[in-house]
Amino acid sequence: MIMRTVRNQPRTTREDLVNDLKAAGTIVTKKTIGNTLRREGLKSCSARKVPLLKKTHIQARLKFANEHLNDSEENWVKVLWSDETKIELFGINSTRRVWRRRNAAYDPKNSIPTIKHGGGNIMLWGCFSAKGTGQLHRIKGTMDGAMYRQILGENLLPSARALKKGRGWVFQHDNDPKHTAKATKEWLKKKHIKVLEWPSQSPDLNPIENLWRELKVRVAKRQPRNLNDLEKICKEEWDKILPEMCANLVANYKKRLTSVIANKGFATKY
């Protein structure tokens, strides 16, 4: 009963199982249940947060993966990947450990200053290709379609030139309404920029997510003091990401597609 319940409902707690078994006439402790599950190779883990996928999203993801499964690596080399991300000032730093004496927890050297709501954050737009990272831009205020097009004008085209994107390069962005707005589509068409058709709710198909994680780890180690410092450090660390890392992400892109297919369209480890 224990294994059957957990297989069908992985979020079941040990207390739930104790109560279910008690109702069925069997008395066991939470410790016994925990030991039983561990013997079966199961352990309690934090549930991963993934985008909410509706049936249409799953179908679109499978369609994308199957249509591009046999694309050559050269096809993906042509792509300039982009995305936005939020970076918290005291996000990762808030769990930093320190060596201190007893009763010295609140010494300034042993604590991390925070303010209400986490100390603030900055929004960034960035892009990369197999040849390396492109420009990184801080988004100030609420981004609308006009601001997005301005960001593209000031950052996308210069990035494409710097990364030596030749004829036939392809631009990737997700299906945010600002990205798919009529004015944005017309702007891209006017600039003769080909856009990769993209399935919604699919950050795991965008390799830039790996670079965002890398950036956040690097930034946290430098312990920025304020938002301006955070922006400066983000740009410095973004520029330090090696082209080899970018090339490797693109070279292994097919693995993302096979994972989506193997997972029947649902979210993957990427």
Model regions: which residues?
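A short, amphipathic alpha-helix used for macromolecular contacts
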Residues: 1-35, 63-77
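RNase H-like polynucleotidyl transferase catalytic core
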Residues: 46-49, 111-112, 171-175, 191-210
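Extended, low-complexity cationic-aromatic segments
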Residues: 58-157, 263-264
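C-terminal anion-handling pockets and recognition modules
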Residues: 75-79, 85, 208-270
